[in-house]
């Protein structure tokens, strides 16, 4: 579910723009180099490319030494093929060998001076890499973690969905239907609050006195992970705003408690800035998961709460009021209620919910017959001649 103003807060997935820019600048610099000195350009470019790939290959050998000596059994079960795939890229090795063969077949002879240049390039690469100068930038690390779904937020979002929302939301619909027989709910959906600062109070009344606990829905009891009849409870709250009172099912996203407590532990290496980014990623990931879930579709509402509301004691009730008002204009489709066609009046009948027309059937003749129609001009306008649509013919029959 979308929340008003979320585009200004929730980060979008990163695009391929850096790769495209790097490729464009690479071709541009190659063109400039060729214009400056076109003498043996392909030979010099091949030698430089071979040197760059060689230094990366030597660094991968250093990675291989670590994996072979200390991690071959625990991480790879002694399988050398997996160790090599983890340390080397097949495309890099093939590219280096292909460039070397092309240079040799092209008649290029590597002199002692050129090998000395290769040694200096490899030495400089090793030293700079060991000092962290050539390491990935924070943006690159973030991009890799997001692309591989390796962030804390990804795990928490999937855990919240698989371990709670996936089975709770379909079952909650039954409780809401029973509750609505005796009391009115402003919305049948579960409203999940996600504060950006990850500070989750034990009671919403602590944040806003206009949000008051009303009562609990009947418990949902399931056998989960060895616990017999584990109880899951949802609460109904009354929200007052501008002398209007609304009621809805409300709760905070409990995984945000984990993010907040991690930021308080020095061993977690999780600062306030990282915590906010993880909350936004949690919101984005959970939204994508729930949007693609048939069990949860149209049964929830994610409400992202901006923490820039210091001094407003009724911020929460105002946000809930706006979301509930926004839902008033939406059509809530109950997937359990099937829509049946309405039968038309007249010769059209209804059989098991399907429209069925009745026509007068005549016995078919075995003798072939010829049917002729009156000739019409090819340029004439089409005229409806059936009795149903032609009032003149209908009047003649009457």
Curated annotation (Swiss-Prot):
Catalysed reactions listed for this entry: H(+)(in) = H(+)(out)
Cellular component GO terms held in the UniProt record: autophagosome; autophagosome membrane; cytoplasmic vesicle; endoplasmic reticulum; endoplasmic reticulum membrane; endoplasmic reticulum-Golgi intermediate compartment membrane; Golgi membrane; perinuclear region of cytoplasm
Localization terms from the record: Endoplasmic reticulum membrane; Cytoplasm, Perinuclear region; Endoplasmic reticulum-Golgi intermediate compartment membrane; Golgi apparatus membrane
Sites where the protein binds 3',3'-c-di-GMP: 159, 164, 230-233, 254
Gene3D superfamilies (UniProt xref): 1.20.5.5200, Stimulator of interferon genes protein
Primary localisation category: endoplasmic reticulum
Keyword Coiled coil tagged: no
Post-translational modification: Phosphorylation by TBK1 leads to activation and production of IFN-beta. Following cyclic nucleotide (c-di-GMP or cGAMP)-binding, activation and translocation from the endoplasmic reticulum, STING1 is phosphorylated by tbk1, leading to recruitment of the transcription factor irf3 to induce type-I interferons and other cytokines.
A UniProt-annotated Pfam family: STING_LBD
Ranges of the Lumenal topological domain: 38-44, 113-120
InterPro entries reported in the protein's UniProt record: STING (IPR029158), STING_C_chordates (IPR047191), STING_C_sf (IPR038623), STING_LBD (IPR055432), STING_TM (IPR055434)
Keywords assigned by UniProt, alphabetized: Cytoplasm, Cytoplasmic vesicle, Endoplasmic reticulum, Golgi apparatus, Immunity, Innate immunity, Ion channel, Ion transport, Isopeptide bond, Membrane, Nucleotide-binding, Phosphoprotein, Transmembrane, Transmembrane helix, Transport
Cytoplasmic topological segments: 1-16, 66-91, 142-398
Record keyword Cytoplasm present: yes
Chain spans, region Disordered: 375-398
Domain commentary: In absence of cGAMP, the transmembrane and cytoplasmic regions interact to form an integrated, domain-swapped dimeric assembly. In absence of cyclic nucleotide (c-di-GMP or cGAMP), the protein is autoinhibited by an intramolecular interaction between the cyclic dinucleotide-binding domain (CBD) and the C-terminal tail (CTT). Following cGAMP-binding, the cyclic dinucleotide-binding domain (CBD) is closed, leading to a 180 degrees rotation of the CBD domain relative to the transmembrane domain. The N-terminal domain interacts with glycerophospholipids and phospholipids.
Family designation: Belongs to the STING family.
Complex and partners: Homodimer; forms a homodimer in absence of cyclic nucleotide (c-di-GMP or cGAMP). Homotetramer; in presence of cyclic nucleotide (c-di-GMP or cGAMP), forms tetramers and higher-order oligomers through side-by-side packing. Interacts (when phosphorylated) with irf3; following activation and phosphorylation by tbk1, recruits irf3.
Protein name per its UniProtKB record: Stimulator of interferon genes protein
Organism of this sequence: Danio rerio (Zebrafish)
